[in-house]
Amino acid sequence: MGRLGAPEGSVSGMELLSGIDRKESRRYVIVSPCRDEERFMRQTLESVLAQTVQPAAWVIVDDGSTDRSPRILAEYATKYPFIKVIPRENRGRRAVGPGVIEAFYMGLDTVNLDDFDYLCKLDLDLELPPSYFEKVLEEMEADPCLANFSGKPYLREKDGRLTSERFGDENAVGAIKFYRTAAFRSIGGFVRQVGWDGIDGHMCRMKGLIARSEDRPEIRFIHLRQMGSSQESIWVGRVRWGFGKYYMGSALYYVAAVAFYRMFDKPYVVGGWGILYGYLRAMLTGAPRFEDKVFRRHLRRYELESLVFGKRRAADRYHRRIRLSHER
C-alpha cells in the first residue's frame, strides 16, 4: 500500500463488483442471536413484521434463554412461517462478543446463502421504522461498492426525547449489520471475538469495498437499551470495548482519544475510563491480538487519518478513493 490509506486488496473488490448483477433481487435473510430478551423482543419482532419489504427468511437462535423468550419466539414462529427458531443449550451466562457470533453462525449454518442477495445480523433489542429495510436496500442498489450499511442508533429518554448513541460513519452498526452476501463472503465473515463489529468494516476497505452508516430520519432506529449494557453493566461493557480495541490492533494513542470522546456519553467520565482500562489491562496482561499484520497496518493508517482529519472526513476520503479505484 503505497500512499496513506489507499485501499488494500482492491483487485478482490474489483472481482467482486464485476460479479454483482445490477438487477439482483431484494431477497434478504435475517439471523438473530438472542438471550433473555423478553423485555424487548416483541418490539423488534413487530417492527420487522411491519416492514414495507419483509425478509424472505428469519432465523432466530435462542442462546439458552432462562426468561419467557422461548415462549414468545414460539408464538411468532407458529404465526409466521418465514420465522425459524433454533434453541441452543444454556451455557449459564450471557456471552457477548464471541458468544454472540457463535450463536449467529449456528443460525447461519442452517441457511443456504446462495438463495439470498443480502444478509442481516439483527439484535432483538431494536425498534425499526417501517421502511427501514426498503431504504437500506435502495442504498445498496444505488451503490455497488457498498458492502454493508445501516442507519444510526438512538436512545429514547424517559421524557420521550431521542438522543444519538454517536456511532461513527465508517461501518454498519453491530446491532443491525446489513451485508451484500457476496461481500460478506469476500471478507471471510465475522471474527469470533470481541471487536468483530469493527474488524469487519476495515476488512471491507482492505478488499476495496465500502462499509458505512448514515444518519437520516427514515433509517434512524431505537436501541431499547444503551449500547454495551447487555452483560452485567455499562462499566463491564466499556471495559470489554477497550479489550476489543486492543484485540483488533488499535494504537494506544487512538484508544486514548476514543476514551476521551466517550467520557461525554452516559455514564459520564466513567465510561471513557472503562474503555482505556480495558485496553491497558489487555496490553499489560499480554492478551492475544488479531494476528493479521496487514490488517493491523491498514487499521493504524486509518486511525491516524481519523485523528488528523476527523472520523467522518477520514471515512469519506477512504470511500472516495475506493470508488475512484473501481472507475479506472
Model-inferred region functions:
Residues 92, 127-163:
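Conserved donor NDP-sugar-binding/catalytic core segment of glycosyltransferases
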Residues 235-328:
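Non-catalytic, C-terminal membrane-associated alpha-helical segments of glycosyltransferases
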Residues 115-127:
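Short beta-strand-to-loop acidic/aromatic patch adjacent to the donor-nucleotide binding site
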Residues 190-258:
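Catalytic donor/gating beta->alpha subdomain of glycosyltransferases that bind UDP-sugars
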Residues 173-188:
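Conserved nucleotide-sugar donor-binding
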Residues 47-92:
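Acidic donor-binding segment of Leloir-type glycosyltransferases
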Residues 37-50:
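Short, well-formed alpha-helical segments that are part of the catalytic scaffolds
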Residues 101-118:
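Active-site nucleotide-sugar/metal-binding loop of Leloir-type enzymes
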